[in-house]
A protein has these predicted regions:
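Carbohydrate-interacting regions of secretory-pathway proteins
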Residues: 26-246
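Bacterial N-terminal signal peptides
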Residues: 11-24
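N-terminal secretory signal peptides that target proteins for export/translocation
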Residues: 1-10
Length: 246
């Protein structure tokens, strides 16, 4: 009787230990989807993979795999060829508080041609923009207006520009046109941030520093150029890698 009782107690103890271990594992944070652009099909991009659209000759310079942008004038450089389905990883950091920049996906060939020839108004193409904005931009807005902006954030907005179209994933901006990030994940001025972008069949998804944050679907156009933006302040990009998909 005693030995049987002891065996029952020992068995119950083992089950309790397993239950507690399982609970501890389930409470642990999930690993981040940190995609670094390594593996089959990925290609490192540099100066030779971009063409100037409407920037000055000295706006962009490349050294040891890092793209340095002065921010002046406002404009873009584009991929040599347009793309449809692809993945992108890139790291970026602003060198000045309140810096503004972006990565354009599917920038329309018509708008790029118009910018190159100076035939259209504005300095930026039509397409889907993945915003690259420093915290200082939001802080300056909040100080001036006494509240947070309802039309932009500094943590990875995704939105259409010009006549381009997109159905944004929630949460949305006040006007319903932008996909706001579900979390505040970007780091401040001088610190490197990591973006992973998936652009497939007219759908865009953005991961910020390893966590999915924003995106949209039903994008038009869904074919076009990949562009890096110069918009007023110095910024650097590095470890830019692209995988073109069928």
């Amino acid at each position: 009787m005693g030995s049987t009782y002891s065996r029952l107690l020992n068995g119950a103890g083992c089950w309790l230990a397993l239950i507690f271990a399982s609970c501890a594992l389930s409470a642990a944070p999930l690993p981040k989807a940190f995609i670094n652009g390594e593996g089959p099909g990925w290609k490192a991009w540099g100066a030779a993979d971009f063409a100037n659209v409407n920037c000055a000759e000295d706006t962009w310079s490349w050294e040891d795999g890092v793209a340095h942008c002065t921010g002046k004038p406002v404009g873009v450089i584009r991929s040599v060829e347009p793309m449809t389905n692809f993945e992108l990883v890139v790291e970026w950091r602003h060198l000045k508080s309140a810096g503004n920049s972006g990565v354009f996906l599917w920038a329309s060939p018509e708008s790029i041609k118009g910018l190159e020839k100076g035939e259209i108004k504005g300095r930026l193409p039509n397409g889907i923009e993945v915003q690259v904005l420093d915290h200082g931009f939001s802080e300056r807005y909040e100080k001036k207006h006494g509240k947070k902006s309802d039309w932009f954030t500094s943590h990875g907005d995704v939105f259409p520009t010009g006549p381009a179209e997109m159905t944004p994933f929630p949460p949305l901006s006040g006007n319903g046109k932008r996909s706001f990030p579900s979390k505040e994940l970007t780091k401040g001025v001088g610190e490197w941030n990591h973006y992973y972008v998936r652009a497939i069949n007219g759908e865009v998804r953005l991961w910020v520093n390893g966590e999915e944050a924003s995106g949209g679907t039903d994008c038009h156009p869904a074919t076009g150029y990949l562009c890096l933006e110069s918009e007023g302040s110095p910024i650097e990009f590095k470890n830019l890698r692209v995988r073109v998909l069928p």
